[in-house]
């Protein structure tokens, strides 16, 4: 079964001005007690485990001894499509349709790893396309150690993510096993489990013990893989637990619970954090079986945050490289399918499209088009030819730049236009995502697994621009810092167009963007892929000045909010709750919004 990619935008203003939500699904299940450890016998046993283990079982103990063996080569799981157990907790679109659905099992797994001290590093990070009907993989760096009771074997574990095919949902898990360079067999079974997700429509526990093979050999570019991992880890932002806010700022009166007061269903929060005064204060990463062992490596979806974090940043990079005339380029000169559109694209600019103000829509009623069959067809289309044609089915209703209508397809179209523009400048091999990653994000030491969905379920497909980035806690905080604190500069060099960035942050005197239709008397504004809410003493008397909060928002409950005091609040959740009011208030206690 090929499942449709469902992108259903939420009430986006809630992420800026107020909290809102939907009833939580009942995900409580009665299960036997989960083991708190996995022994040598457990990992060599052929028995199917009755329940998932506690997730802390996959973590390297604080008193662990150094590894006695080195893992380098390929790890293969043997016939994963016939192994494991699943408990489905929520399945809004019947992905788990029975008859051995591919969603009930892992898909084929074959990955190379290298070891650097106690770090186990996958040779390929980022999104790995498997061809499965259900899942692709993202595999992150893990750890290697020895402990008593393992009969001379070395123990390894690592985090992995099941990313739905043509979808931005993430289902996070861990794997662990024993291995040896001198014993036979050279590897135990692999114990795996998936017990957490950021996915509003599908929730499940998936676990098992599966036979595996370990093929040792020297992995190509192993020294570079190790060096890159060392560099990325060394350049992460300073990090502390959120609880440290009360000790770092003892006189502020900060109340930790208020940071997420906009969110009623706390069990549906994956993780959140507040970057302030140079420190990334982070929550944990709770699962249904305790704390996730690799919180800093956990892959988080972005959905429509991609419109800001990728599309808008790419546009500002092009503006810095080639001048502000990029913004007024016409879509029709770069996307030939526009000439066969049901609408009128003759005068639609890059700016109009990234502002979601092309004038081509069915209805200006708030979010009506997002729920239309036409948008569903566009969102579910996987191959580029179908997707780009489905993007142009909306008729013309208004002049470009006059009416804001939330449209995934417009963001996709401008992404293709920017890609074509870049290829005209740099050659046919240029790619807009690769340029954005290499020019903007790699220099700030973004995680190696930072990646995007592409069309055709293929690494050679086109980037989307409307959805699809996969990030970590550190990634979100770093991107907030780049935009909100560093003015688009990296190591003293201006990387993003500074004028457009200030306009995007609403720190220029003029008002930019269009009001978001349906957001009330104090509307949010949308400009350059970002939402912005205006705070005044009249509307928010706790503040004595006028200021704007700019936010990136994504389906399910993804928010990255940039506050004018230089702090960034981010959260990944999946109960369709959105808000940053609580975080804004607590951040204000530490560093006032109004000088």
Predicted regions and their residues:
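C-terminal motif of bacterial Sec signal peptides marking the signal peptidase cleavage site
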Residues: 16-19
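Penicillin-binding protein/beta-lactamase superfamily catalytic region
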Residues: 386-392, 398-407, 420-427, 450-564, ...
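A short, well-structured edge-of-sheet supersecondary motif
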Residues: 250-294, 559-560, 568-570
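Active-site SXXK
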Residues: 301-326, 414-418, 476-479, 483
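Structured C-terminal helix/loop/strand segments within mature extracytoplasmic catalytic/sensor domains
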Residues: 101, 107-114, 127-130, 137-251, ...
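Active-site-adjacent helix/loop patches that line small-molecule binding or acyl-intermediate pockets
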Residues: 247-272, 340-446, 471-477, 481-485
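Active-site helix/loop module of the DD-peptidase/beta-lactamase fold
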Residues: 35-58, 62, 72, 321-361, ...
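Long, solvent-exposed N-terminal ectodomains/accessory regions
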Residues: 27-180, 184-188
């Amino acid at each position: 079964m090929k499942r449709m990619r469902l992108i259903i935008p939420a009430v986006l203003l809630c992420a800026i001005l107020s909290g809102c939500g939907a009833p939580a699904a009942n995900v409580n299940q009665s299960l036997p007690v989960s083991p708190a450890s996995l022994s040598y016998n457990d990992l060599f046993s052929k028995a199917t485990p009755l329940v998932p283990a506690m997730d802390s079982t996959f973590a390297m103990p604080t008193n662990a001894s150094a590894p006695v063996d080195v893992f380098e080569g390929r790890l293969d799981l043997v016939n994963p499509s016939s192994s494991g157990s699943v408990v489905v907790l929520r399945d809004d679109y019947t992905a788990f349709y029975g008859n051995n659905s591919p969603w009930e099992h892992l898909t084929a797994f074959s990955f190379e790893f290298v070891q650097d001290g106690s770090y186990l590093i996958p040779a390929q990070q980022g999104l790995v396309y498997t061809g499965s009907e259900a899942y692709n993989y993202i595999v992150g760096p893990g750890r290697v150690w020895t402990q008593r009771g393992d009969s001379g074997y070395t123990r390894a574990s690592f985090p992995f993510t099941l990313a739905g095919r043509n979808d931005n949902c993430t289902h996070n898990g861990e794997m662990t096993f024993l291995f040896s360079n001198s014993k036979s067999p050279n590897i135990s079974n692999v114990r795996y489990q998936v017990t957490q997700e950021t996915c509003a429509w599908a929730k499940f526990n998936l676990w098992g013990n599966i036979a595996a093979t370990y093929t040792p050999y020297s992995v190509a570019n192993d020294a570079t893989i190790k060096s890159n991992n060392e560099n990325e880890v060394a350049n992460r932002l300073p990090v502390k637990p959120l609880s440290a806010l009360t000790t770092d700022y003892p006189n502020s009166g900060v109340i930790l619970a208020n940071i997420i007061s906009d969110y009623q269903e706390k069990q549906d929060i994956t993780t959140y954090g507040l970057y302030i005064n140079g420190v990334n204060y982070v929550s944990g990463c709770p699962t249904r079986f305790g704390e996730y062992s690799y919180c800093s490596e956990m892959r988080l979806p972005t959905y429509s945050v991609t419109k800001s974090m990728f599309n808008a940043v790419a546009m500002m990079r092009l503006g810095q490289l080639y001048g502000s005339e990029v913004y007024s380029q016409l879509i029709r000169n770069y996307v030939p399918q526009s000439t066969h559109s049901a609408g009128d694209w003759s005068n639609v600019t890059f700016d109009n499209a990234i502002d979601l103000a092309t004038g081509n829509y069915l209805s200006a009623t708030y979010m009506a088009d997002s729920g239309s069959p036409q948008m569903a067809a566009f969102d579910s289309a996987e191959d580029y030819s179908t997707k780009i044609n489905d993007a142009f089915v909306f008729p013309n209703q208004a002049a470009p730049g006059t009416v804001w209508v939330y449209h995934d397809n417009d963001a996709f179209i401008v992404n293709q236009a920017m890609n074509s523009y870049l290829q005209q400048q740099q050659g046919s091999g240029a790619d807009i995502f690769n340029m954005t990653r290499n020019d903007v994000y790699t220099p700030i030491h973004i995680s190696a697994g930072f990646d995007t969905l592409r069309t055709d379920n293929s690494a050679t497909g086109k980037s989307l621009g409307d959805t699809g980035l996969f990030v970590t806690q550190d990634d979100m905080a770093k991107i907030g810092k780049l935009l909100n604190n560093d003015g688009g500069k990296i190591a003293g060099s201006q990387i993003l167009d500074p004028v457009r960035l200030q306009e995007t942050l609403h720190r220029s005197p003029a008002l930019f963007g269009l009001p978001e239709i349906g957001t009330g008397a104090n509307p949010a504004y949308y400009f350059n892929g970002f939402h912005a809410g205006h705070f005044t003493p009249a509307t928010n008397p706790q503040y004595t000045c006028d200021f704007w909060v700019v936010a990136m928002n994504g389906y399910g409950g993804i928010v990255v909010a940039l506050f004018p005091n230089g702090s960034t609040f981010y959260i990944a959740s999946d109960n369709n709750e959105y808000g940053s009011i609580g975080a804004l208030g607590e951040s204000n206690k530490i560093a006032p919004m109004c000088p």
